[in-house]
Amino acid sequence: MGEYAAIEKEAKLFTELCVHNDAIDPNLFDEFGVKRGLRDKDGNGVLAGITNISRIDAFEMRDGVKTPCDGKLWYRGYNVYDLIRGLRGKRYGFEEVAYLLLLGDLPNEQQLHEFTDCLTKCRALPSNFVRDVIMKAPSKDLMNSLTRSVLTLASYDDSVGDNSLQTQMEQCIKLISVFPMLAVYGYHAYNYYLNDGSMYIHRPRPELSAAENLLQMLRPDQQYTPLEAHVLDIALLLHMEHGGGNNSTFTTRVVTSSGADTYSVIAAALSSLKGPKHGGANIKVMEMMDDIRAHVSDVTDEDEMRAYIGKIVDKEAFDHKGLVYGMGHAVDSLSDPRAVVFKSFVQQLAMAKGRKADFDFYNTVERLAPQVIAEKRHIYKGVSTNVDFYSGFVYNMLGIPVELYTPMFAVARVVGWSAHRMEELVNVDKIIRPAYKSVMATRDYLPMENRG
């Protein structure tokens, strides 16, 4: 295919026309009661559906008053904290929690063995897929690579047009199984062809968990420590699911409701997750932390740290958007339970890696940023760290390249997407179609010669 035609001049003009004609008076949104972002002024989401997969508790009723509380995240009725505590030092949790989210119950030993064996059997790509699809079209944007791979897999599936629930379940399980390979192999192709790096393709090993296989496929020597694998496993578990209203999961529901096939649905969810306001947040955290280090002469000086964080909030520093990335969440209020649980594992890994000073730096920002935000902004609820604040730091300590940060999120969240797709198919047979209020003025048709 040839190069795209250069239309920079025309595009500039078209953009100016678009901005002029598309601008809507912001007051109209309030006048018509529009919930922008499908959220009210307090940040609460518009009720769009019912789910039995997960729940986030950010508020509780006290004397009849809705009051912010420390967050709790429930997977199929189980507190995520209890799920992780039950795994501590015993086994990896990705497969067990995937079973729980997808099928609704915690597996017994035999059920877990059968499910894990099923994932292992599906952990294979079609013949020459890596060569013909991943290697021949490497991309620096690994989310694009991942999305393309998912859509291409549909052409290898003879049952793609079969709408039975059993076929949808089979396709979901297969995608959950191969996502680690698609992500890691996509990175190796990029690193070799576009980054002048080395390339090595390690096959997944059947006796290893998802977290272990991710590390051994990514690293040239295939070596990792139990702590590294365990912390990555916890990271995957905490990113698997976060309710039906997050952007990519709601996208899953919307596209599923149209009757689209599994591959198209998951590709749409990936496209949503790719956005920096969603799956790319941990990259922004890392960039922000690097910026703070570069502009604060002594990161142990809390007055200097507080002053620079204030500049970020005032849009005078970093990307001038006024956001302290990794702080706050659309649903959680006083705390993100994922961040609370994750922090102890982050600390363990930091100590093992000789990164205590870096952990202390993150801890300082975590403590000071909410104070600065509260001083400078009118906020409707508490501000606390979310799971994105620490996940990029963990990936960095594990030697995972930044290009893989969002794909790692996808490796975990495809489990939640699959669970929500199945729940939508089981319970709903109506396309999602919200309303938009038109505020355009009607005009009389103008013949060509009268248009000026």
Which residues does each predicted region cover?
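Non-transmembrane, aqueous-exposed alpha-helical and coiled segments at domain scale
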Residues: 1-452
